[in-house]
Amino acid sequence: MRVEIITPDKELFKGEAKSVVVPGVDGSMGFLNNHAPLITVLKAGDVKLRTESGEEVFPVKGGVVEVMNNTVLVLAE
């Protein structure tokens, strides 16, 4: 699936991932291909991506995640 992680200052990641785990306000949430559409708020924690080359971790202070059409967009602080 396509993943973008964007902060007000810069784009942290743009590319493909096998899975994404985000720190939702009600607990961690994981996304795989063909996930149902979703928009939710994030709390401080780590966004974890599993890519072809391994795992990548991006700390965030909060934000919003949108999942739609095999695209995960993280607007992070």
Regions found by a protein language model. Name each.
Residues 2-77:
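Compact, glycine-rich, soluble single-domain proteins
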